[in-house]
Amino acid sequence: METRTVKASAMAACLGAFGRPPDAVLSGINSGPNTGHAILHSGTVGAALTAASFGVSALAVSIEVSDPMRWTTACALVEPSLDRLCAAPAGTVLNLNVPAVPLDPLPELRWARLDRFGSVRVAVGGTWEESLQMEYRSTGIELDPDSDTALLEQGFATVTAIEGIAEVAPDELPRSGADRRKLRAVLRHLPGNTPGDDGRVETHSFADEP
C-alpha cells in the first residue's frame, strides 16, 4: 500500500488505519547517515519515534552515501537488528547506521552513544533579497570515540536505543549550578505536581540551592 504524506504521518498505520496495527515498524533505509543529536531533524528517525508513541517498537535504518550505494550491506544488518528489537519491550526505538562498505565481510555491529552533534551541521550559505541558501557542512569538532558518528567513520555499523519526547523535572536538568538556580528562581512560584507511590499528587515548591 502506498501513502503520500510525511513519514511520521504514515504512522497512522499504528492506529489501525490500514488494518491490524503492525508488530514493529521499519523506517528507512535512508540514504545518508542519521547520527548524533542531529537526528532531531530526521524524518526517518521521527517516524520511528512516532511509532513508539503508539506503543509500537521501531527500527530506523540509514546508510552512508556512496557510489554505488551499499543497500545489500544495510539489508543484511536489518534482520539481526529486528531480532534485537523484537526481544526488547514494546515501544523501543533502535537507530541503526550502516557504513558504505561491501557486504563481504559484513561490518561489525557496535552499540554506540549519540554524538553531541552529528556527521554534519546546517549552515546558512548565503542570503539574497528573496532567497536563502542552506548548506550541510562538517562540524569541525573532535568526536567522542564511543559516539555513533566516530564509530561509523571507522567502518562499524552502529545501533543506539533512543527515546522520544519526555518531561524532565528542573532538579534533573543537566545544567550548571548557576543555571539551575536561575531556573529555580523562574519556577519559584509555580507548584510542581509529583505523583507519589500511592498515585496521589503532592504539591511542592522549588527551593534555592546553596
Regions found by a protein language model. Name each.
Residues 73-210:
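Electrostatically charged, flexible surface regions
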Residues 17-22:
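Glycine-rich phosphate-binding loop signature in dinucleotide/nucleotide-binding domains
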Residues 52-74:
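Glycine-rich phosphate/pyrophosphate-binding loops
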Residues 47-51:
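Hydrophobic/aromatic ligand-binding patch that stacks against planar heteroaromatic rings
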Residues 33-42:
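Glycine/threonine-rich flexible loop motifs
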Residues 5-6, 30-33, 101, 164-165:
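Short glycine-rich anion-binding loops that position phosphate/pyrophosphate groups of nucleotides
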Residues 1-14:
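A cross-family phosphate/adenosyl-ligand binding-site feature
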